[in-house]
Curated annotation (Swiss-Prot):
It comes from Leuconostoc mesenteroides subsp. mesenteroides (strain ATCC 8293 / DSM 20343 / BCRC 11652 / CCM 1803 / JCM 6124 / NCDO 523 / NBRC 100496 / NCIMB 8023 / NCTC 12954 / NRRL B-1118 / 37Y). This is Large ribosomal subunit protein uL3. Keywords: Ribonucleoprotein, Ribosomal protein, RNA-binding, rRNA-binding. GO terms for cellular component: cytosolic large ribosomal subunit. The keyword Cell membrane does not apply.
Amino acid sequence: MTKGILGRKVGMTQVFTESGELIAVTAVEATPNVVLQVKNAETDGYSAIQLGYQDKRTVLSNKPEQGHASKANTAPKRYVREIRNAGDEFNVGDEIKVDTFQAGEYVDVTGITKGHGFQGAIKRLGQSRGPMTHGSRYHRRPGSMGAIINRVFKGKLLPGRMGNNKRTMQNIAIVHVDVENNLLLLKGNVPGANKSLLTVKSTVKVNAKHPEVKMANASASATNSEEA
C-alpha cells in the first residue's frame, strides 16, 4: 500500500536531535487533503485515489469541477493528483492528514524544479569553457557540431531552457511530524521553489538499506515549525 499527501514547500530550517546534532530540514505544509474519487481495477483499469489540495474560489472553477467536488462535499480544489495503489480503505470525502506518516519513515518527494530560463551550455550543462586569452575566439560557445554530417548528433551540449522540470527525490527521511501545524519536516532539501506544490509518497525502494533516522528534539522542532 502506498501512502501519499499533497503539500507545499514552506522553506528550510534546522532542528537539533536529542544528542545536540544539527539537521537541516525542509518544512512541507500539508493541510488536510480530500479524497475526491476512488478508482479500482474493475471500473478504471487500475487502483488509485484522487486527492484534492487547497480550495479554489467558485468563480474560478467551471461546472464540471464544481460537480466533481460536490460528490465529496467539499469546495473545488486548486491541485488534483492521484496516488496509485493506496488501498481500499478510503471513501470519497475522507481527509488525509500529516499523521498518515510517522517520524523515521522514508518517502519520495516529487516537485517542479526552479526555472532559470534560457541559459548557455556552461551554466546549463557544466560544459568547460575555452581559453580566454592568447587570441582564442572560442570562449563560451557550444563548440563544433561535427565535420561533414548535415545534422546535429543527439546529446550534443547546447543552450536551452534550464530547470522547470518534474523531479523526484527518493529515500528522504521524515525527521518530525507536526500534527498541530500540519507540517512535515524532511531531512535535507527537496525539489522546487518555496510555495510550490510537492507530492509526498511512500518510498518505492522499500528494501533499500536505510540509515537510522535521528529524531528531532520535540521542543526545538515546535519552535522551528512556528518560525517556518
